[in-house]
Amino acid sequence: MTNRTASLRRETSESGIELSLDLDGTGASEIHTSVPFYDHLLTAFAKHSLTDLRVRASGDTEIDVHHTVEDVGIVLGQAIRQALGDKAGLSRYGDALVPLDEALVQAVVDLSGRPYLVHAGEPSGFEFHLIGGHFTGSMVRHVFEAISFNAAITTHVTVVGGRDPHHIAEAEFKAFARAFRQAKAYDPLVSGIPSTKGAL
């Protein structure tokens, strides 16, 4: 079994990102994005996916947090893709249904090699809510888009119910984390790459 790790840096005129991860970790994290609620969400992702994650990011947050939030998602997706390797022996698929008080979210992940996102069910107006002083609800979709397209995975995230924007966003990240944890796990019954095509 090879080490499933990745370390990446990304510098643009809008942000600077340093990120490292270990897919076979314990959920340890050290997250500093300069966007506190985003730190909270990424910490939850690491904990519930059992991925060790270190992120240090800076950006033009005096303009908006959008660039920093999306760019971290891009680098996280790239790191996941690199660390997964050829995906031989993996379960490939994962699903989870996660509550957080009144919020309930379902997530399904396929390490398909085909980037796709279906994101549905957030209550009307959710995207305009400001959570934690900096993070708007619309950022949640941007993060899942960035991760899914750069990791080349198929992701479905569906909000089944919920009222509190904090609870909904956090449940989305936790559900995605639990589904990803299943998908990236080794399956002792799987020999080779889990696809009839022979590649993912």
Curated annotation (Swiss-Prot):
GO terms for cellular component: cytoplasm. Pathway: Amino-acid biosynthesis; L-histidine biosynthesis; L-histidine from 5-phospho-alpha-D-ribose 1-diphosphate: step 6/9. Its main location: cytoplasm. It is an enzyme of class 4 (lyase). One of its GO terms (molecular function) is imidazoleglycerol-phosphate dehydratase activity. PANTHER family: IMIDAZOLEGLYCEROL-PHOSPHATE DEHYDRATASE, IMIDAZOLEGLYCEROL-PHOSPHATE DEHYDRATASE HIS7. Belongs to the imidazoleglycerol-phosphate dehydratase family. NCBIfam families: PRK00951.1-6, PRK00951.2-1, PRK00951.2-4. This is Imidazoleglycerol-phosphate dehydratase.
